[in-house]
């Protein structure tokens, strides 16, 4: 955490101390990585911050960031190249990075250290549901037949299969018949 924190503006330490009581260390680390990407974006893409080192950004820079800047950031993180390596974020990644930014801005806004909170004006991107992939009736029958018969198994595998065949068929029948998810 300290290594990542050292690459951020000094005022970020106050944020991490402030949220320490109600966030896990993993959450704070994820925030740090996400904020680093945001500040790198500001440094390379935003004229307000381009002349300064990231570690030298003053807190007042947060008041000069607009809603449009944050929307440009979300567009930027869809696909970007850093140090010759390509990075991309799907809807879920963008949502997480925006949530980190909202928490960051909310902390300073509630502490009355900044006057504006442009992150609050940016709607969280909608996350589309993943399509459920289902087996058709023939595929279910083939799967159950394979479990019952245990074809193409070695002697030791066949010995183990004979002991667990009824259990395996029962479990698969339960999962396939009720739609219980294994996750």
Language-model region placement:
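Conserved catalytic core of the tyrosine transesterase superfamily
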Residues: 1-183
């Amino acid at each position: 955490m300290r290594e990542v924190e050292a690459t951020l503006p000094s005022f970020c330490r106050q944020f991490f101390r402030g949220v320490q009581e109600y966030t896990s260390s993993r959450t704070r680390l994820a925030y740090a990585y996400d904020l680093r990407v945001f500040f790198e974006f500001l440094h390379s893409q935003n004229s307000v911050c381009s002349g300064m080192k990231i570690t030298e950004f003053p807190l007042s820079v947060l008041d000069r960031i607009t809603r449009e800047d944050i929307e440009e950031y979300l567009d930027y993180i869809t696909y970007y190249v850093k140090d010759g390596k390509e990075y991309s974020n799907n809807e879920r990644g963008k949502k997480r990075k925006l949530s980190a930014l909202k928490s960051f801005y909310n902390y300073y806004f509630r502490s009355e250290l900044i006057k504006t909170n442009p992150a609050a004006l940016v709607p969280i991107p909608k996350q589309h549901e993943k399509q459920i992939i289902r087996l058709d009736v023939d595929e279910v029958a083939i799967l159950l037949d394979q479990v019952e018969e245990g074809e193409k198994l070695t002697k030791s595998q066949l010995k183990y299969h004979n002991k667990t065949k009824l259990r395996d068929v029962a479990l698969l029948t339960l999962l396939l018949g009720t739609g219980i998810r294994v996750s």
